[in-house]
Each structure stands twice: as structure tokens, then as C-alpha cells.
Amino acid sequence: MRLQLAVDLYDLDLSLTPSFVSSVYERKAKGEWVKVAGYLSGKLMIKQLKPSKLLIKCLTDQPKLVKKLVEYELGLWHEPFEHGLDKLPRSVRSVLVKLASAYPGLRLPISYRDQFYIFVAVVLSRRANYDRWVLKWCKRIWRLYDGRLEALINADRSELTRIGSSYQVMLLPTLLKGLLEAVRCLGGLSSFLKLDPNLARALLIKRCKGIGPKLSDSFVLSVFKAPHIIPCDVHLVTVASRMGLIGEAKVKLPSKPLCSKYVCSEKASSLTRLPVCPRTSSCVRSRLQRMVGELGGWLQTITYLHGRSYCRTLRPKCNVCPMREDCKGRP
């Protein structure tokens, strides 16, 4: 089956590369990806023919199903985030417009079929380079345990060393078991995915040992339609601080004890019946959510890309940074 999709302001490589959904794909060439794990593994190929057109090839004759899957997994379920920039506060709008122009066409892929695969990639990413280590570990896991979650949970140390010897790999069975137990208490994965994303986030943090705010946010952002979710990492804090997005007052990162029982806003509180966090005024996640709203996940992804390429914590590339004129932290 061949299918062509018209797209507006979209970049396939820029959208998939930083996303955890990329863990079930493999980039074959510029603008060309094939699915290597999960649903339609080995049957789906996607290529960006030109800025306004994608080519989809799939070894199944179910065009409606494939189109829906592709729209979710490529981030096409949401309009270009650039369209929402004019609604931002004037104090940050010009900086974010310029930052967006450096990374045009970025969307947020989500997976509604391969949630356990995404969870594996997310938990492996804790303090690990995604491109160098996580993708390599994932490929080995897909090859050895593809679709057999119980076998991975019950794997002993000798089996796990076939994947890697890092603590991230060794902890994987325990974290997967915690996720399964958490979703079973709710009636299964389908029931979990029907929860409000803010509540799902809090439940993961509360019930899954070893899962804190960053990992929970990363998972929810990758499997729910929840573009406001902001995983807080060093790139986000560094870039946001240097660009003047979070003010001069010192901010705090989200914490597991608070995030397991509170939410960041009155709106989230009304949807989840959880109280508003007492730290909202000083928490970087809450502060940025109030500022950018639905653009939260998009902003986090852009700061990840920008932080990795230019705005590094150590030895930043200020002399070639496209944002150097707007940076309040450059020497």
C-alpha cells in the first residue's frame, strides 16, 4: 500500500529524532524512516518527499488504520505549534518566535499502540545519552524480547548483560514490573490511557518505584495527547534561564514527593481532584506551563535540541548560536 500525505510546516527528521517514538523506528537516510519494533514492525516506511509531502509505504491493505497510526506517530495529530506563538505573552514571544525559526516544523509524535516499548526507552534514558546508548540498548531489547514483556521482566542478570551492563539496563525489569502492577490496579492499560494525563502522571510517580517527575512526564508526553506536559531536564533549565524565560528568581525542579500528590494548576486540579502544589510559584515546570500552555512539550523538545547543539551547560557554542543576540547568559 502506498499513501501520500500533504503536510504543513513539518519536518520528519526534526520531529522523530528527539522523540522516544524514534526508538521503534530506524532512520535509513535523510527524511526516510522504517519501523523496526512494535505494531507494523518491518512493514512501515515513511519518507519526506518535499516539505509539503510525505510518502507512506506499508505491507498491509488498511489505509485508514495506517493513516491514523502515522498521524499519531509522526506528530501530525496536532497543528503546527508555530501557529500558537502569537498567543504567548509579549515578554517571551519574540524569543520563542526566533527559537522556533531555528527549528521549523517540529511536532510531538505519540504512540497509541506501542506504549510498553516507549516506556522501555524512557526509563533507559535516565542519565544516559539517548543517541549513543538508549537507542543501542533498545535495538538489542527489540531483537531479544520483541513483544515479550513478561520474558524481559523475568530476565536474570546474565540475560540482561546481553543488552548492556549499565544500571539502567539492570533496573529495567523492576521498573517494568512496577508499571504493569500500576496499570493492572486501574483495570489494565486501556483504562490507564483513558485517565486525565495529569492524573496518569501523578499515579506513575506515586506507584512506580524509580519513576520520578521527569520520566513520568516523558512517558505521558509520548503516549497521551498532552502537549502541555513538560519533562524538566538540564537542557530546559539551561536554555530557559539563558533566554530569560523563567526570570531571575531561582527556580526549583519538580520533586517526586510533591508531584505524586499535587498538580500544577487550578485547571488540572478540577480535572483530577488533586490539590494544587504549594510550590507552583517557584517550580520551573509550573512557571513555564503558565507561560506557554499547550506549547509546553514543544518548548521542552526545542530546548533539548538547542541545548544539545549549542547551549550546553559546559563549553556552550555561543559564537555560532542562532540565539546569541537574545541570550542573557552569554559571556
What are these regions (language model features)?
Residues 1-331:
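HhH-family (HhH-GPD) DNA N-glycosylase catalytic core used in base-excision repair
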